[in-house]
Amino acid sequence: MKPLYLFFVVLGTLCSSFAQTGKVMDELKLNSKILKGERKFAVYLPPDYETSSRSYPVLYLLHGYTDDQTGWVQFGEVQHIADKAINEGTATPMIIIMPDADTGLPGYTNAISGNWNYEDFFFEELMPHVEGRFRIKKKKQFRAVAGLSMGGGGSFLYALHRPDLFSSAAPLSAWMGPQTLEEMNDFAKRENMKFEEKNFNAFLEHNNPLKLVDQMSKETLNSVRWYIDCGDDDFLYEA
């Protein structure tokens, strides 16, 4: 029995050694004219990226408040989870893009102050850059967005603002940002940011998911596949 046991141990070790692994780069940079400076992002490339010439679907994975582009790599174990899912056949090989939305003013929206337009950067600079640099399929059906907490709010808004670009969205424990003037004042004080109260209603109109959903046709809303998750005891549940 012992030799047979050892045989299966060795066989398991050999099989695991053949499992392909992807590649993560978490200090990539691009220069942003919109944000007037250098921006960092991380990328996960699937196991067969270096040995194939094919193009891949893309997932834009957004981090939470106080994290940066390394959050999903270091704490979310994105490489281990993606490799395992791809090798087991439960996920298709894909490229995952993880941008930094913490350096400067944190958040994925265009700031109410008007001097930090992160959402414009995301759609006008980041997406064209990475989809030109890596072999990414550029059609809606091959593009998804997901995120946690602040990133969950970002994925919610991006899919609602641009349903023509994303086929799927997965907001996880989404923080939707300030939804009242009092919350906006608290956020501005915490981030040392100035804004004019007269601009708040327009900001809220553009960044409140309930208002955005009400303005969309059922057909447009259903053109995106939604996975929305938040635990019963999560303090963000009310959002």
Feature map (PLM): residue ranges:
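Non-catalytic cap/lid and distal C-terminal segments of serine-dependent acyl enzymes
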Residues: 20-239
